[in-house]
A protein has these predicted regions:
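Acidic, Ser/Thr/Pro-rich intrinsically disordered cytosolic tails and loops
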Residues: 1-278
């Protein structure tokens, strides 16, 4: 009798293992994967090419840095890189190449009379205008030296506070609760409303899609019609360089150069300030 039960148990175990394997094979073919980055383990569509949070980069920054169980990253320089690439895609920045000797030097020329309606975004834009000097050219070393000579709060405001304000204005945050967890700075981590969480979830879906693209994993076809938007968020996630390498056949040489230049300028912008205030 015990021998029969052992045989039956082994048979059921084999069936269970085979069924589980078959399920994951079918799920993979249907374009699903599992993500643990947000709200626990959840099955999501592999390809998510939807602009999250209406394209508001400050809100995305807040979600990434303040919401529990999402991301725990200090991404201010990545936020600046994302804005730089967005301004380039909007025509406010243009690539300038000069050959003073044997090596081409890349700059970004900045349109100093550009109109940016958002006050905080414009504040950041104006600082890059100042860093560009009289010739209006953003060059890595010059941006670093400008930043070093202007120590202090480079933003002039908190990107996270700006993001929280946007989420509040759009009814996506729960009211203040004394029981909410505290950040390292003592601020309350306010949870998103269910509707807000659903919209914020698109951010991690996009991040998962871009991460899979950067790693060369199956993630569905790439919609090249909005590849500049994808590269903007790639900057925010710190993987734009990897994306540019993987998408090199879909990008112009200029786009590839600008991706790296935006990253380098953003790093120079913050490294100079950090070293001046250390």
């Amino acid at each position: 009798m015990l021998e029969k039960l052992d045989t039956l148990g082994a048979y059921l175990l084999a069936v269970l293992m085979a069924g589980t394997f078959l399920y994951f094979v079918i799920a993979h073919q249907l374009g699903f994967k599992y993500a643990k980055k947000l709200f626990g383990t959840r099955r999501i569509k592999e390809q998510s090419q939807v602009i999250p949070l209406e394209g508001n980069l400050f809100a995305a920054c807040y979600v990434r840095t303040n919401q529990p169980r999402i991301f725990d990253l200090h991404i201010h320089h990545e936020l600046s890189a994302a804005f730089l690439y967005r301004w380039y895609s909007e025509g406010k920045l243009k690539l300038v190449q000069q050959k003073p000797a044997f090596e081409t030097v890349n700059y970004l020329s900045i349109q100093k009379d550009a109109v940016i309606r958002d006050q905080e975004e414009n504040s950041l834009y104006q600082k890059f205008c100042e860093a560009s000097g009289k010739d209006g050219l953003l060059e890595v070393d010059e941006v670093y030296h400008w930043s070093y000579s202007h120590p202090g709060d480079l933003y002039g405001f908190s990107p996270e506070d700006k993001g929280q304000e946007w989420l509040e204005d759009h009814g996506m945050m729960e009211p203040v609760n004394p029981k909410d967890k505290l950040t390292n700075l003592g601020a309350r981590i306010r949870p998103l409303t269910p509707a807000g969480a659903a919209k914020a979830r698109v951010l991690v879906e996009l991040q998962n899609f871009l991460q899979a693209q950067a790693e060369g994993k199956p993630s569905g076809p790439l919609d090249t019609d909005w590849i500049d938007d994808l590269l903007c968020y790639g900057q925010l996630f710190g993987i734009a360089d990897k994306l540019a390498e993987k998408w090199r056949t879909s990008l112009t040489e200029e786009q590839t150069i600008v991706v790296g230049l935006c990253r380098d300028l953003a790093l120079a912008f913050f490294n100079g300030n950090n070293e001046a205030t250390d």
